[in-house]
């Protein structure tokens, strides 16, 4: 589903994975950092390069299905996501276990992007275009769709 900081269209608790994309990498990173600080007990995420997910999709699926040794799952952040990941991710994202959060970081994706379309069309996925760096506004809106 398309997420915005102007409000959610559906129940945010259904969202298992969020695609953060925008033209300014610093703004995208800021949104992710702020989101993690409010939505997760873990203030940081385990970063995985998109190229690694593409080259070893089975390893990524295994990582998603492994229970955490700790009480809370550490969010997974896929950095540098592009349309080339769409087919690789479509099935594993539908099988994300309860409590696991998968975030994707990408440069700006056009409305015709297959990855963006995937995240906007599925009810358990969300896409967020990061274009405004206004900290109080961002924090307020992130708090309004806290996944926990």
Question: What is each PLM-predicted segment?
Answer:
Residues 1-148:
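Conserved beta/loop motifs at nucleotide-recognition and modification sites
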């Amino acid at each position: 589903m398309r997420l915005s900081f102007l409000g959610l269209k559906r129940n945010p608790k259904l969202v298992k994975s969020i695609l953060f994309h925008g033209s300014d990498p610093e703004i995208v990173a800021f949104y992710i950092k702020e989101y993690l600080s409010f939505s997760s007990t873990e203030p940081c995420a385990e970063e995985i390069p998109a190229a690694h997910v593409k080259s070893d999709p089975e390893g990524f699926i295994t990582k998603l299905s492994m229970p955490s040794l700790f009480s809370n799952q550490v969010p997974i952040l896929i950095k540098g996501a592009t349309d080339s990941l769409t087919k690789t991710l479509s099935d594993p994202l539908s099988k994300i276990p309860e409590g696991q959060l998968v975030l994707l970081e990408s440069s700006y994706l056009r409305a015709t992007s297959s990855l963006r379309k995937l995240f906007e069309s599925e009810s358990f996925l969300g896409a967020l275009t990061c274009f405004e760096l206004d900290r109080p506004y961002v924090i307020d809106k992130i708090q309004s769709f806290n996944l926990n």
